């Protein structure tokens, strides 16, 4: 059985960890960083860049560089949150045939799951490079307030990336695992305040010792899946663009290249204002008009930034109140407050949390890594490596069906511990009704139209009977991933229809399989490109070496041999420019063979040079001197 890795698939950054010798370890990526920007770029030559390389080229390729795609995953194009993003993103958000929000890059429509899969593939490769073995299983985290469609879409992204997603767990719950695993302080109630790049969650969790077992029980959860650091950045972008417009009369928002530069500068300024009281955004040659180039220089104080985002911070407090109310607790009953997500580094956010809960948040949890660490611990639990840990999570939103009059009848209330199962008997609305449509909903509104539709299915061939007589038993079953399975059964005939809820949107099995094949083809292409680069490097090294030797020792070989070497050199150079891996390797080997005589001459010349030097000192190199001196050496270990 392979290793189960833990992945925090974030809006802005992602992170991967694994259990090693009983402890979770965050793995550094190929660039040497512990977190990877959740950015995917599609280059003109078909190459797909992920992470830091994608971020570096974003300014010159804004329309084909996708960031914050987590805000679109599992969402319908018509949703107001998606419509809001359409006007803000430099890349194109389009409506898919199934009504989902997809992106368009280089005239190709792509699902958010496909883009997310590229990030997951990078995380998978990071783990494989570190472990030295193939990784096929993972625990992936999602915001606690993600609905069923978003959870299912995240699981699909894992499949496209070549991962079997063993468990989907909520980000605050994962952070609680990371925090509480080594704490032996008895029963504690903690609040996990998770303000990430694109989502906000608050979870109230009880950590208890039960018969020697560490039990993590989520008492309640709440949040906003469209509130995060990206929104804080946007407030800063809007302000800087407005100031520039006042001063120069040019609207930077109409220029995608300028906007991308502005986004990078705003993100940097936001980070600087967490430690400093003032910063300056300097962007020379940001744009130009008839009068010539324009330069941007705007000073921003911490107080100004705080006033710009005050409303966003206030928006996080209402879910905190609701979560406490649902848990039946007051702020004084919370023992610890944990901050998760990069945006919680902002002093004003820390102050708001401190003011609400009446206590200093803990500083001993890394806000960028805690979620991945918790996911790795859950992977260890599933693998049997981590023992005596029980995780009891909840469903964040109520689940039910549409009944007569367009009302939502709830079968499973929000904050119910999962996995769980609930059944209720319904009947027909008309005489002799032969079929019923079960319309599955998720949300807290009383009317069906105000809630998220998760899908629907029919139960047909109901025997004719007066209305209200047939007994249709509807059963909801939520698995440990928080994903819903629904069945409807006619109790009179025993006829049953069941489905795993796949939203009226979502990807079909055929689409997922096609995307898996695309991803595999990309991986194969990547490997071929990697091997080609290796062959070119080896050839370049050989060409350089032979050219150098030819310049120094060319007069020591015959004219024919020199001509053969020069011919082999030219063929090798041509192969490097235009050839495939096999051609390059063949021509490199031919060059090595052709230059063999030259190498011999070079070796003899080096020996001749070394001989006089050997004769002037101790004659240890001469024949007949068999004395061997044993040298003592001390190994110096790195401190």
From Swiss-Prot:
Record-linked PROSITE patterns: HSP70_1 (PS00297), HSP70_2 (PS00329), HSP70_3 (PS01036)
Sites bearing Phosphothreonine, chain numbering: 199
Disulfide bonds: none
Signal peptide: none
Entry keyword annotation includes Cytoplasm: no
GO molecular function, one term: unfolded protein binding
Induction of its expression: By stress conditions e.g. heat shock.
Region (Disordered): 600-639
KW ATP-binding (keyword) present: yes
Keyword field: ATP-binding, Chaperone, Nucleotide-binding, Phosphoprotein, Stress response
InterPro entries per record: ATPase_NBD (IPR043129), Chaperone_DnaK (IPR012725), Heat_shock_70_CS (IPR018181), HSP70_C_sf (IPR029048), HSP70_peptide-bd_sf (IPR029047), Hsp_70_fam (IPR013126)
NCBIfam families associated with the record: PRK00290.1 (NF001413), PRK05183.1 (NF003520), prok_dnaK (TIGR02350)
Main function: Acts as a chaperone.
Family recorded in the similarity comment: Belongs to the heat shock protein 70 family.
HAMAP family named in the record: DnaK (MF_00332)
Protein name: Chaperone protein DnaK
Organism: Thiobacillus denitrificans (strain ATCC 25259 / T1)
């Amino acid at each position: 059985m392979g290793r189960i890795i833990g992945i925090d698939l974030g809006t802005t950054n992602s992170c991967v960890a694994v259990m090693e010798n009983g402890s979770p370890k965050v793995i550094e990526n190929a660039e040497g960083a512990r977190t990877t920007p959740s950015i995917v770029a599609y280059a003109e030559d078909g190459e797909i860049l992920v992470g830091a390389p994608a971020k570096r080229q974003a300014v010159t390729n804004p329309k084909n560089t996708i960031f914050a795609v987590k805000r679109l995953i599992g969402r319908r194009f018509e949703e107001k949150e998606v419509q809001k993003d359409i006007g803000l993103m430099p890349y194109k958000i389009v409506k898919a045939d199934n009504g989902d929000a997809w992106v368009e890059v280089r005239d190709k429509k792509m699902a958010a799951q496909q883009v997310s899969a590229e990030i997951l593939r990078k995380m998978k490769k990071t783990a494989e490079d570190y472990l030295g073995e193939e990784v096929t299983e993972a625990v992936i985290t999602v915001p606690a307030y993600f609905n069923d469609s978003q959870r299912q879409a995240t699981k699909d992204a894992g499949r496209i990336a070549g991962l079997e997603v063993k468990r989907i767990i909520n980000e605050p719950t994962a952070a609680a695992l990371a925090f509480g695993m080594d704490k032996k302080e008895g029963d504690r109630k903690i609040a996990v305040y998770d303000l990430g790049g694109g989502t906000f969650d608050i979870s109230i969790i009880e950590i208890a010792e039960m018969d020697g077992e560490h039990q993590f029980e989520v008492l309640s959860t709440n949040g906003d899946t469209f509130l995060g650091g990206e929104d804080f950045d946007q407030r800063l972008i809007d302000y800087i663009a407005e100031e520039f417009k006042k001063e120069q009369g040019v609207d930077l928002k109409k220029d995608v290249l300028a906007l991308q530069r502005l986004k990078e500068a705003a993100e940097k300024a936001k980070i600087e204002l967490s430690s400093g009281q003032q910063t300056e955004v300097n962007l020379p040659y940001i744009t130009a008009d008839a009068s010539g180039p324009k330069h941007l220089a705007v000073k921003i104080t911490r107080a100004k930034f705080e006033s710009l985002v005050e409303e966003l911070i206030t928006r996080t407090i209402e879910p905190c109140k609701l979560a406490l109310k649902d848990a039946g607790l007051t702020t004084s009953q919370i023992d610890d407050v944990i901050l998760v997500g990069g945006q919680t580094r902002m002093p004003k956010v820390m102050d708001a949390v401190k003011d609400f809960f009446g206590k200093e948040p803990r500083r001993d949890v890394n806000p960028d890594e805690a979620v991945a660490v918790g996911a790795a611990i859950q992977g260890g639990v599933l693998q049997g490596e981590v023992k005596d840990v029980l995780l009891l999570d909840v469903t964040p939103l109520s689940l039910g069906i549409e009944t007569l009059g367009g009302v939502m009848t709830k079968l499973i209330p929000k904050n119910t511990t999962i996995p769980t199962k609930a059944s209720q008997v319904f009947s027909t609305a008309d005489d002799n009704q032969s079929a019923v449509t079960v319309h599955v909903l998720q949300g807290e509104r009383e009317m069906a139209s105000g809630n998220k539709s998760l899908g629907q299915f029919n139960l047909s061939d109901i025997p004719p009977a007066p209305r209200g007589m047939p007994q249709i038993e509807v059963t909801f079953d939520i698995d440990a991933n928080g994903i819903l399975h629904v069945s409807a059964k006619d109790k009179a005939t025993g006829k049953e229809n069941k489905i795993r809820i796949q939203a009226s949107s979502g990807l079909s099995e055929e689409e997922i399989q096609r995307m898996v094949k695309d991803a595999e083809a990309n991986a194969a292409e990547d490997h071929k490109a990697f091997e080609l680069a290796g062959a070119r490097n080896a050839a370049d090294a050989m060409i350089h070496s032979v050219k150098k030797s030819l310049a120094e020792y060319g007069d020591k070989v015959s004219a024919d041999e020199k001509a053969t070497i020069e011919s082999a050199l030219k063929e090798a150079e041509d192969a490097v420019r235009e050839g495939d891996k096999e051609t390059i390797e063949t021509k490199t080997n031919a060059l090595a063979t052709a230059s063999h005589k030259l190498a011999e001459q070079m070796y003899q010349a080096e020996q001749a040079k070394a001989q006089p030097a050997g004769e002037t000192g101790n004659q240890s190199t001469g024949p007949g001197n068999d004395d061997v001196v044993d040298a003592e050496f001390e190994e110096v270990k790195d401190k």
